[in-house]
């Protein structure tokens, strides 16, 4: 309490004393206050507050108890107060002079005490009311819990009575809830009114009391709202359940009727599903009549169904049924039953009709089968041959099948359709069984054609088996014979090889027998006149020839090996005999004292061994000659190391000859020693006897040699071979005679030394030696002639074996072979055979010439070589003729090989062409299947690259075709006319197809290029529409903040400066779009294709016209002072412009700008993470906020300087009015694959640079230099990903997002409206800028073909163009940020929404899983730059968010910071290094679920040094110069 107004103005108030009263936790302090002469009581302190009611009933009761105690203690002081007042009265009576003062003191103290007691009484009443309120609330909550428990407990009912009692319980609970709710509301209202009244009573109202009243009211309202929310929700559930129960009761009667109808339909359906279709034609007709009766009865039940359906429809339309689904299901069930019944009726009618057709066809089949059975009996009695009978049986078999096929097919069809229930088709099965049994019985009697076919198949199988066996045998033998023959180094090894070849010879003979068997079977098949075996003789002929060749080769090798093995064995035996005789003649020295019988026995034994040795030695010699002859007759390279083998054999023969001569000398010496001890007379007698005997033998030999002298060398090989065999048999005797002559000569020398009378025998011995020497010379000549003659006849006979079978083949035309490999094999075999024949011819001629030369010697004058000379001449002529024929045949085969090779190469080219064409068609088809959204610019460019690849493949194919054509054109003259024509036609056909396909590819590529250019132009148009729309919106917004006519005038001029040059350029683009569309899709379709662009252009022009009109009207209204109305009009226009901005562009960009929008979305999302504080404003704007408030200086404009009043309007230089934007695909655009990156990143960078400019931040030049990135950095950034720039700039001010409806579509769509804003720099002369724009326009007006050429330029040129585009950007771009007041106005509703959601979360019955309202997006930054990764997550309870990097939990340290503000979570890295790159995951989790968002951080090197200052005039001059040069070069 305070004192009343005192007459003393300057009096002070003091506290005389104070009294504190405690009771439990309650406490009050009463102060006695004195002001001058006035004294009053005042409640200085109260704990708790007088209006504090507590938070629960227990707390309120405790407060009431403490207050009762406090009040009781205060009552105890009342007597002292009244005693003090009485004392004051006494003092006043005693001091009359100051009675007035004491009266006043008494009055104020009394009033204060009464007031204090009254307040405490009122608080006690307040606490009592509060206790009653909490009690009512508790009862209300208990009732709510009971009702909730009632709802949560499942209720089951089996009858309508139980359902009605349950409905009564619902009504009672609802009524009690309403009563408790009204009672609680009354109590709360009573308590609130009491608090308000208590707060406003008397003069005791102070701030503490007001605060206590507000706190208590808030508690009451919160508890009341919580309970009322539960009550309302519970009441809704009660009403809903009651309504459902009443609807269930309403449906019971309908269900009963529905069950009755359904039961009849179900029974009828079961009958229809189980009834048979009949077992005969009469039975089936009876069932058809019953079915017609059922149709009549079904119509009555259909009417009952329609009645129920109408009732159900009325129930559904009249009320909102809780059991609507049940009713619908029952109704649907009834409909399904009716439909099923109708379907079954229709099916049964159709099946009965089909069964009727089946039984009719079955009766006809039985009639035909009866006739066939009678005819079969007739055929059996006639005794026809197998082929004739087979033909008859086949005809009858066909007739059986044809006659029963219809009935059986109808039966199978009917059974397959009625397969769900086999009982219905039992009669059909039985009838089909009867028919099938009858057919099987008759088919068993018609088996002649099957037997005939089986026999034919057996023959064919046998032939195939034999031929397969022959081919396999040839395949096994051919690789063995392909190797060179190695006769080995020892007889055992040679014998093993010989056995192997003998086995091969046996195998060849067996194969030949199999081939003969196949030929016999083929002959048997030909007797059956089977046309399909016509091609087999050619194959058999080829196999016979191949087998014959292999047989000759095996025979030749076997003979060589046999001769070699026999030679080696014979030489070894001869060597053993030689060594044995040598040892005998060296060791067995005859002694004189030995018995003559012993010496004679030894001599005879040695003589026998000597004779055997001679035979074996000459046999070995003959085998060696035969082996050499075989080697000479063998093919070239047939034997491995031929010269070495011949040398080995010559060494063996030379060694054996020398050994024979040595042994002969040893034998003579042994004989001389043997007779040395005999008397001279005896030796002489023995000499004379031996001389006479030897002379007789020599004369006999002379007579034997006489027939040889008369020999005709032109005889047959047989006679010559017999003569040579006899000659070989005589060689041991001749050798023995030679040895005898030598022995006689030695004995002559020995006897002459002993003084024997030799004169009488000297002449005889001389004649003997002379005759023997002549005979030996003649024998050697005859032996050589005979050997060569035999060899000549052997070679001649071998030639006959080789040439005769080939004569017909050489004269005939070569067979048409399938592949070049077969032709190559046959050509190689022919060349090999010709070389062998030429070798044999040359060998025969050489032998013949040698024989004739030998015969012409004087010693051989009696030998006739006339016939041999004739044979030699004939052989030479035959050799020339055959060689010519063989060469001609090889030439034909070579031509065939060239033809096959050329044909195969052309076939390969055709296959390559087919493969290219198939893949190209697949490429076209896959591209045509893509929808319009997938067929974006990037996909189109990739398609063009693929088409270019196929064009290169076609050119490579053309080069291969040219090579093949050049190679085959020279050989066309050697081909037969038909083959040359075939190759020529095939080549021409391939060339034509390739030309046609090349034209298709070229046309398709041209179409794709035009489509690409069309999409580029459309993107340019859409880009201009977006910028123009955004500019119109910004100008409209800025105009609402302008307060002077001059500011609006400047704004209007700046807008006209932007829009005037760009509209004609946009109209040119639109015309180009129309022309391209008409060229691609035709006149009408092209016009429809361009309608959207034209319509949107008209809308933009209308908005521009409306804006200009609004600005003019605004200037007039500002002159008249009508600002409020003007602002409202502009706000309406501004809203319309925003609708225009967000409306038409969406549909246009779906098709043509989908990928660029995605790039912008990602770039904008990353920008949204960086540089934003909790109030949503960019950091740089907050840093300059103080400068903005203190500075009144505006930004200097290019033409005018604003006054103080004009500075109220945002500077027009901040409007960011761009000229015609550089599109991603224009001649001055970056490369095609960087559309997304440059569109998003450069647009964001240039747009953000405007936000760093403000009228209050300083001069223009400095701001321009700091805001624009360097050209090198810009060009490098264009090659990096689209998020590179986002880490260097702050988040753009989201003005357009707040004003457009994009905010309701999520952050992704909100960020798609960032644009490149370009205008003429303040320092650039307007003439230079206009000239640059004019040159750019001229470059875009080039022809379509030139634009297609420019589109294919290198990335280097496009990168330079990107640099020019960067230099043309004004640094003072961007939108003016809103004031803090407008920002508060925009944030306000969001705060209310958040509070509302918080209140809802208190009473929600279930949690909300985490949800990312902003996701992470991939970021690419330069090393050393700052970066922020930010997400925004919501959910209830509030989710906890954890950051992970590469799978490991991320924690804050000195390098990075993990930040959290409300629902936003972010990771901030001031300086990025390469180690920071990787996958980052933000995982949000609460009790309702877990959710994560991922992004990849890329770190690139920083190679571009910053440019601290730019000379804009120089940059613009460079830009214009490069543009002019580029335009001139591309003309």
Curated annotation (Swiss-Prot):
Modified residues (Phosphothreonine): 91
Compartment list: Cytoplasm; Cytoplasm, Cytoskeleton, Microtubule organizing center, Centrosome
Originating gene: Ccdc141
Compositionally biased tracts (Polar residues): 1392-1401
Keyword Phosphoprotein: yes
Cellular component GO terms held in the UniProt record: centrosome; cytoplasm
Leader sequence residues: none
Chain coiled-coil ranges: 67-94, 865-892, 947-1000
Role this protein plays: Plays a critical role in cortical radial and GnRH neurons migration during brain development. Regulates cortical radial migration by negatively controlling the activity of histone deacetylase 6 (HDAC6) and promotes centrosome maturation. CAMDI is required for dilation formation of cortical neurons during radial migration. Plays a critical role in learning and memory performance through regulation of AMPA-selective glutamate receptors (AMPARs) cell surface expression in competition with KIBRA.
Assembly mode: Interacts with DISC1. Interacts preferentially with phosphorylated forms of myosin regulatory light chain (MRLC). Interacts (via the N-terminal region) with HDAC6; inhibits the deacetylase activity of HDAC6. Interacts with KIBRA (via the C-terminal region); retains AMPAR in the cytosol after internalization.
Biological process (GO), any one: cerebral cortex radially oriented cell migration
Post-translational modification: Ubiquitinated and degradated by the CDC20-APC/C pathway. During brain development, CDC20-APC/C complex degrades CCDC141 after centrosome translocation into the dilated area. CCDC141 is restabilized in the dilation until the centrosome enters the dilation, at which point it is once again immediately destabilized by CDC20-APC/C complex. The oscillatory regulation of CCDC141 protein is needed for proper cortical migration. Phosphorylation at Thr-91 by PLK1 affects CCDC141 degradation.
Ig-like domain mapped to chain residues: 1410-1498
Effect recorded for residue 660 to A: Does not affect ubiqutination. Abolishes ubiquitinatination
Protein name per its UniProtKB record: Coiled-coil domain-containing protein 141
Disrupted-gene phenotype: Knockout mice are born at the expected Mendelian frequency and are viable and fertile; they have normal body weight at birth and during the juvenile stage. Adult knockout mice have a normal appearance and exhibited no obvious changes in overall brain weight or morphology. However deficient mice show delayed cortical migration and abnormal behaviors associated with psychiatric disorders. Deficient mice exhibit impaired recognition memory and spatial reference memory.
Biased composition (Basic and acidic residues): 1172-1191
Pfam families: I-set (PF07679)
PROSITE patterns, alphabetized: IG_LIKE
Keywords for this protein: Coiled coil, Cytoplasm, Cytoskeleton, Phosphoprotein, Ubl conjugation
Keyword presence, Transmembrane helix: no
Ranges for region Disordered: 1170-1230, 1368-1401
């Amino acid at each position: 309490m305070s004192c009343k107004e005192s007459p003393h103005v300057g009096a002070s108030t003091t506290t005389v004393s104070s009294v504190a009263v405690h009771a439990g936790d309650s406490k009050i302090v009463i102060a006695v206050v004195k002001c001058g002469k006035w004294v009053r009581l005042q409640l200085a302190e109260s704990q708790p507050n007088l209006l504090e009611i507590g938070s629960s009933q227990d707390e309120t009761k405790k407060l009431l108890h403490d207050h009762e105690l406090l009040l009781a203690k205060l009552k105890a002081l009342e007597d002292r107060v009244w005693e003090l007042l009485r004392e004051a009265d006494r003092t006043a009576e005693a001091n009359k002079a100051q009675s007035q003062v004491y009266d006043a003191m008494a009055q104020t103290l009394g009033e204060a005490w009464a007031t204090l007691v009254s307040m405490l009484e009122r608080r006690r009443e307040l606490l009592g009311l509060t206790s009653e309120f909490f009690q009512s609330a508790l009862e209300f909550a208990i009732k709510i819990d009971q009702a909730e428990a009632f709802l949560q407990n499942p209720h089951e009912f089996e009858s309508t009575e139980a359902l009605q009692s349950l409905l009564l319980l619902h009504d009672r609970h609802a009524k009690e809830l309403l009563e408790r709710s009204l009672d609680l509301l009354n109590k709360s209202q009573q308590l609130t009114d009491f608090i308000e009244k208590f707060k406003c009573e008397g003069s005791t109202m102070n701030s503490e009391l007001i605060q206590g009243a507000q706190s208590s009211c808030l508690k009451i309202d919160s508890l009341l709202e919580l309970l009322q929310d539960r009550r309302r929700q519970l009441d809704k559930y009660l009403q809903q359940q009651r309504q459902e129960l009443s609807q269930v009761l309403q449906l019971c009667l309908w269900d009963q009727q529905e069950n009755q109808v359904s039961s009849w339909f179900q029974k009828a359906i079961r009958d229809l599903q189980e009834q048979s279709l009949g077992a005969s034609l009469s039975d089936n007709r009876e069932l058809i009549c019953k079915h017609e009766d059922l149709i009549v009865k079904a119509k009555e039940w259909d009417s009952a169904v329609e009645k129920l359906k109408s009732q159900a429809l009325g129930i559904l339309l009249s009320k909102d049924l809780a059991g609507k689904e049940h009713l619908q299901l029952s109704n649907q069930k009834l409909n399904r039953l009716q439909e099923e019944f109708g379907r079954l009726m229709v099916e049964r009618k159709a099946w009965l009709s089909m069964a009727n057709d089946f039984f009719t066809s079955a009766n006809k089949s039985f009639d035909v089968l009866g006739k066939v059975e009678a005819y079969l009996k007739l055929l059996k009695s006639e005794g026809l041959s197998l082929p004739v009978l087979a033909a008859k049986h086949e005809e009858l078999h066909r007739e059986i099948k044809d006659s029963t096929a219809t009935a059986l097919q109808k039966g199978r069809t009917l059974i397959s359709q009625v397969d769900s229930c086999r009982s219905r088709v039992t009669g059909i099965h039985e009838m089909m069984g009867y028919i099938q049994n009858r057919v099987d019985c008759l088919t068993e009697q018609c088996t002649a054609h099957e037997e005939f076919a089986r026999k034919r198949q057996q023959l064919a199988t046998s032939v195939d088996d034999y031929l397969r066996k022959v081919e396999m045998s040839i395949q096994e033998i051919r690789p063995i014979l392909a190797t060179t023959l190695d006769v080995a180094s020892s007889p055992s090894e040679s014998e093993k090889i010989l056995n192997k070849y003998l086995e091969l010879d046996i195998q060849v003979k067996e194969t030949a027998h199999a081939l003969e068997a196949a030929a016999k079977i083929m002959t048997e098949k030909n007797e059956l006149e089977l046309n399909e075996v016509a091609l087999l003789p050619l194959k058999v002929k080829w196999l016979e020839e191949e087998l014959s060749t292999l047989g000759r080769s095996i025979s030749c090798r076997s003979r060589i090996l046999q001769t070699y093995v026999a030679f080696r064995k014979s030489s070894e035996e001869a060597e053993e005999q030689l060594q044995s005789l040598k040892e005998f003649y060296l060791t067995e020295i005859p002694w004189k004292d030995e018995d003559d019988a012993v010496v004679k026995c030894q001599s005879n034994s040695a003589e026998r061994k000597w004779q055997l040795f001679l035979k074996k030695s000459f046999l070995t010699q003959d085998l060696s000659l035969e082996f050499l002859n075989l080697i000479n007759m063998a093919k070239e390279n047939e034997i491995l190391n031929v010269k070495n083998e011949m040398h080995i054999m010559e060494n063996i023969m030379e060694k054996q000859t020398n050994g024979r001569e040595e042994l002969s000398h040893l034998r003579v010496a042994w004989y001389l020693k043997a007779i040395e001890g005999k008397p001279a007379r005896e030796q002489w007698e023995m000499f004379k006897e031996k001389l006479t005997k030897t002379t007789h033998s020599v004369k006999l030999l002379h007579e034997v040699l006489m027939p040889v002298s008369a020999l005709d060398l032109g005889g047959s090989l047989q006679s010559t071979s017999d003569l040579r065999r006899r000659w070989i048999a005589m060689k041991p005797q001749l050798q023995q005679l030679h040895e005898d002559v030598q022995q006689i000569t030695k004995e002559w020398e020995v006897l002459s030394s002993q003084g024997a009378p030799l004169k009488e025998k000297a002449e005889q011995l001389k004649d003997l030696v002379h005759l023997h020497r002549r005979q030996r010379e003649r024998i050697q000549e005859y032996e050589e002639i005979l050997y060569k003659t035999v060899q000549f006849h052997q070679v001649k006979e071998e030639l006959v074996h080789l040439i005769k079978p080939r004569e017909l083949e050489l004269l005939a035309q070569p067979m048409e072979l399938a592949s070049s490999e077969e032709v190559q094999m046959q050509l190689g075999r022919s060349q090999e055979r010709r070389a062998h024949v030429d070798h044999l011819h040359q060998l025969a001629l050489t032998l013949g010439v040698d024989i004739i030369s030998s015969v012409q010697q004087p010693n051989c004058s009696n030998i006739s070589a006339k016939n041999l000379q004739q044979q030699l001449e004939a052989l030479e002529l035959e050799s020339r003729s055959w060689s010519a024929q063989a060469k001609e045949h090889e030439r034909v085969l070579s031509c065939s090989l060239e033809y096959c090779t050329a044909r195969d190469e052309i076939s390969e080219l055709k296959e390559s062409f087919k493969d290219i064409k198939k893949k190209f068609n697949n490429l076209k088809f896959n591209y045509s299947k893509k929808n319009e959204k997938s067929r974006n610019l990037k996909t189109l460019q990739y398609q063009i690259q693929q088409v270019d690849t196929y064009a290169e493949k076609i050119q490579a194919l053309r080069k291969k075709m040219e090579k093949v054509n050049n190679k085959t054109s020279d050989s066309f003259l050697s081909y037969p006319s038909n083959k040359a024509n075939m190759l020529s036609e095939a080549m021409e056909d391939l060339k034509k197809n390739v030309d046609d396909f090349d034209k298709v590819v070229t046309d398709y590529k041209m179409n794709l290029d035009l489509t690409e250019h069309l999409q580029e132009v459309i993107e340019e148009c859409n880009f201009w529409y977006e910028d123009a729309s955004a500019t119109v919106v910004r100008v409209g917004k800025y105009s609402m903040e302008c307060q002077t006519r001059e500011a609006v005038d400047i704004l209007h001029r700046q807008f006209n400066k932007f829009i005037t040059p760009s509209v004609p350029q946009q109209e040119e683009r639109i015309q180009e779009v129309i022309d391209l569309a008409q060229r691609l899709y035709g006149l009408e379709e092209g016009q429809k294709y361009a309608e959207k662009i034209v319509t949107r252009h008209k809308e933009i022009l209308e908005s521009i016209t409306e804006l200009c009109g609004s600005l003019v009207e605004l200037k007039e209204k500002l002159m008249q002072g009508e600002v409020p109305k003007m602002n409202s009009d502009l706000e309406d226009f501004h809203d319309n412009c925003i609708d225009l901005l967000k409306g038409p562009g969406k549909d246009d960009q779906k098709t043509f700008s989908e990928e660029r929008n995605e790039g912008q979305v990602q770039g904008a999302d990353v920008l949204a993470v960086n540089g934003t504080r909790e109030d949503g404003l960019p950091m740089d704007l907050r840093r300059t906020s103080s400068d903005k408030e203190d500075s009144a200086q505006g930004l200097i404009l290019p033409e005018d300087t604003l006054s103080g009043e004009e500075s109220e309007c945002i500077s027009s230089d901040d409007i960011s009015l761009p000229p015609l934007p550089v599109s991603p695909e224009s001649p001055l655009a970056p490369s095609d694959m960087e559309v997304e990156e440059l569109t998003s990143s450069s647009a964001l960078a240039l747009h953000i640079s405007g936000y760093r400019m403000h009228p209050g931040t300083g001069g223009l030049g400095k701001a321009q230099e700091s805001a624009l990135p360097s050209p090198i950095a810009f060009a490098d950034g264009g090659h990096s990903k689209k998020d590179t720039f986002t880490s260097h700039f702050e988040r753009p001010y989201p003005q357009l997002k707040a004003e457009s409806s994009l905010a309701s579509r999520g952050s992704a769509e909100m960020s798609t409206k960032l644009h490149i804003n370009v205008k003429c720099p303040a320092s650039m002369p307007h003439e230079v800028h206009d000239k640059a724009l004019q040159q750019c326009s001229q470059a875009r007006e080039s022809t379509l073909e030139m634009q297609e050429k420019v589109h294919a330029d290198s990335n280097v040129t496009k990168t330079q163009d990107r640099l020019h585009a960067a230099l043309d950007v004004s640094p003072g771009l961007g939108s003016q940020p809103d004031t803090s007041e407008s920002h508060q106005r925009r944030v306000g509703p969001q705060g209310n929404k958040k509070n509302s959601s918080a209140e809802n979360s208190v009473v929600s019955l279930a949690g909300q899983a985490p949800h990312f309202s902003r996701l992470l997006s991939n970021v690419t930054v330069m090393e050393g730059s700052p970066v922020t990764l930010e997400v925004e997550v919501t959910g209830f309870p509030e989710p906890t968010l954890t950051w992970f990097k590469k799978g490991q939990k991320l924690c804050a340290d000195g390098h990075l910071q993990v930040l959290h503000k409300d629902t936003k979570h972010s990771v901030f890295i001031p300086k990025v290094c390469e180690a920071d790159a990787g996958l980052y995951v933000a995982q949000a989790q609460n009790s309702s679920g877990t959710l994560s968002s991922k992004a990849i951080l890329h770190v690139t090197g920083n190679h571009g040094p910053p440019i601290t200052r730019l000379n804009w005039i120089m940059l613009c001059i460079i830009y214009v110069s490069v543009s002019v040069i580029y335009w001139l070069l591309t003309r």
